Amino acid sequence: PTYPSWNLEISDLTRIDVWLEEFREFEKNGKLPQFQIICIGNDHTQGTRAGSLTPRAYVAQNDLALGRLVEAVSNSKYWADTAIFVLEDDAQNGPDHVDAHRSPAFVVSAYTKRGFVDSTMYTTSGMLRTMELILGIPPMSQYDAAAMPMFNSFTNKADLAPFKALPARMNLEEKNPPNAPGAQRSAQLDFSKEDAAPDIEFNEIIWKAVRGANSQMPAPVRSAFVRAVDDDDEEEEEREARRERQ
């Protein structure tokens, strides 16, 4: 109940401190819930708003918070029976070179393949379906029922070695100067709730903050995902449709 909700003025490290306090109590009393949702969302950042943390500092705090969470769980008595799924809430229409819908995703478990990059095309629904299968619950909708579970990320041999969070390699309190690229526009944007800022404009502000004021952000790429149909199959489907109409 004391876990801070959305507020970019509260560090994700503070959020993890609150979560850790409760998690240690669960370790003592054995009452850890079967399923938890943990939001550490300050990697949204406030762009280059003067005086706020830089995008680099916000993301570094977020990374360290996640690392501390994984370290705590992997060193706990629950590790052998736990999987941690990490996903952005929204791809934000970013300048990904393959498709603007793509998001980085991580699965951390004693039963995931370590050091493995799974290039299978999964969806958010597929991640939900994987959680449902682990928990032994039915799909919530037709979308997760039909989605590909993340089978390829897992193995049947456990590696119980714990993880250790790496220390931050940059200043976690780095602030935006008044003359940062996009500072004036960032001051006008609404950060009181998630994803209220125009995504492409905000992406460009962050891009220039990280890559340099004179750098050019690539335009978003939007790929089409279609089911390939053999010509013979298509003709058979048309014939079947005509028979049904008759």
Question: Where are the regions a protein language model picked out?
Answer:
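N-terminal pro-sequences and low-complexity stem/linker regions of secreted or lumenal proteins
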Residues: 1-246
